[in-house]
């Protein structure tokens, strides 16, 4: 097996100094195009591979970022990761991805494992343990950024859409359409993001002087099955809702199926609203009214924040908590309609 070529040997073959080779392989603009091309050609011909361990000893950075997600199959998470990876690639960072499977304990263990490795920072997307007093979500030397959640600790950073405001706006939209029996299907594993959306829902009802009915609130889970079962519970009530706010678009999609299984129609018989504006939401029949979350932008901004936190100028300096909140946009579509006499009769008669 051929021994890997060293920078020193490349320098000898290219008739340049060792520092020149190092700069050329990093595409330093101080190195001329012809010299850089010659050095890179020699390196490629001899199968040069950079010694990442040696580089990290010099730079005190590994150029690896840990990323913990609840479910890699979740379209929301996929969009966020695409934004993260775009910025990471621009700065020559690699991502170590781990899936918690929606288990808060497993998520915390994953963060612990990443923190104990020689990585530069950790991103936690749709954090399940974000509200828990875990020591790994407190004062860490390695920065942690939560996406779609936040933590009460002083040194855990976060980036979110305006969850409270978004839920309040979409509930106000339903109120403006005349609805008063408005249900909420939440995510019992949603952490702070679910709490904020639930508070927004309640705030809108209070502002409109509409009585809060606890039986209209279902704590399900963010999944098709969770939305289906949550909606079925609401439809089984003697006094049914005429409209429902869902934690996210996946939950709303499950609610669609439950409504149709009951022989009813979305919008005509019951209005449904989501949160996220996933790629399929505008293609549903009827198209889904929802809050647009700029998911890719959230990933980009989270990665930029993490890069700022790991920059040499910030090393060994305690940084106060950074909380970035991005406004969402109400997308009014076909799944919500004005309260009709048909709605009113069904709400008070049940199935």
Question: What kind of region is each of these model predictions?
Answer:
Residues 1-62, 351:
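N-terminal helix-turn-helix DNA-binding module of bacterial transcription factors
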Residues 180-181, 212-216, 265-272:
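Short acidic capping loops at alpha-helix termini that bridge into adjacent secondary structure
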Residues 69-79, 97-106, 149, 159-169, ...:
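Hinge/beta->alpha junction and helix N-cap segments in small-molecule ligand-binding domains
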